A protein has these predicted regions:
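Long, hydrophobic alpha-helical segments
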Residues: 52-72
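Short cytoplasmic-facing helical segments at TM-TM junctions of multi-pass membrane proteins
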Residues: 74-91, 167-170
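Hydrophobic core segments of alpha-helical transmembrane domains in multi-pass membrane transport
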Residues: 27-29, 148-157, 185-194
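Selective transmembrane-helix segments that form parts of the transport pathway or gating/packing helices
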Residues: 13, 17, 21, 86-110, ...
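Membrane-interfacial helix-loop-helix connectors in multipass membrane proteins
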Residues: 34-55, 107-146, 150, 155-176, ...
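Final/C-terminal transmembrane alpha-helix of multipass membrane proteins
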Residues: 170, 176-196
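Hydrophobic alpha-helical transmembrane segments
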Residues: 1-54, 85-96, 119-137, 191-205
């Protein structure tokens, strides 16, 4: 079962990874340019702010939104057709693929940010960027992303079990599910920020 879940998570990741990398890189380029040209921050400071933004807000949200649009029909179908293991086949891959996609988004943002900055080279810039990652912030972001996707997959599984097969693939149902997944994600983010891991802003050197 575990190997099956891993293979499914790998396939699900392949549906989203390219877009996640692209959006991460675009965000990294845009934010670093804004910070350096608009706020006159140094390259090191800009990368620290980029990492902070990716881990506390942008990364998990972008990954979740892309996954919702790409994987919701798949989660719904698995919940409806998975048989006695439908719950595992729906929630398991969703929980596993979230952290992997967040790593893709973070690496894309760092590469984009380094290329947009005035760092001496890509390797040196990446070292500065990776060095700015706080382990507990990274762990929190990984867990939060996994939670977002698992909660959305659970919603799809519930709908797949509740709806008739001919209704479960309807476009209006998919759109409704995505909207509810977004609302669920916002609620989970609010609870996480207030009760589990409040955001703290570090002092820039």
């Amino acid at each position: 079962m575990l190997m099956r879940l891993l293979r499914m998570a790998e396939r699900d990741g392949g549906r989203c990874a390219g877009l996640v990398l692209l959006i991460g890189a675009v965000f990294g380029v845009g934010l670093v340019r804004l910070l350096q040209e608009g706020l006159q921050l140094s390259p090191q400071q800009s990368l620290r702010v980029l990492v902070l933004a990716m881990l506390h807000l942008v990364g998990p949200l972008v990954v979740a939104l892309i996954a919702f649009t790409r994987l919701t029909p798949l989660w719904l179908r698995r919940g409806r057709q998975g048989g006695p293991h439908g719950g595992w086949l729906t929630l398991g891959p969703a929980f596993l693929v979230g952290p992997l996609l967040l790593i893709h988004a973070l690496m894309g943002a760092l590469v984009g940010g380094v290329l947009a900055s005035a760092q001496g080279g890509l390797e040196l810039g990446l070292l500065h960027g990776v060095g700015a990652i706080v382990p507990m912030d990274l762990l929190s972001a990984l867990l939060r992303t996994a939670l977002y996707l698992a909660a959305a997959a659970l919603l799809c599984f519930w709908e797949g079990q509740r709806r008739l097969p001919r209704q479960a693939g309807a476009e209006d149902l998919i759109a409704s599910l995505i909207a509810r997944e977004i609302a669920l994600m916002v609620g989970l983010k609010l609870i996480w920020t207030l009760a589990v891991h409040p955001m703290t802003l570090p002092t820039l050197p």
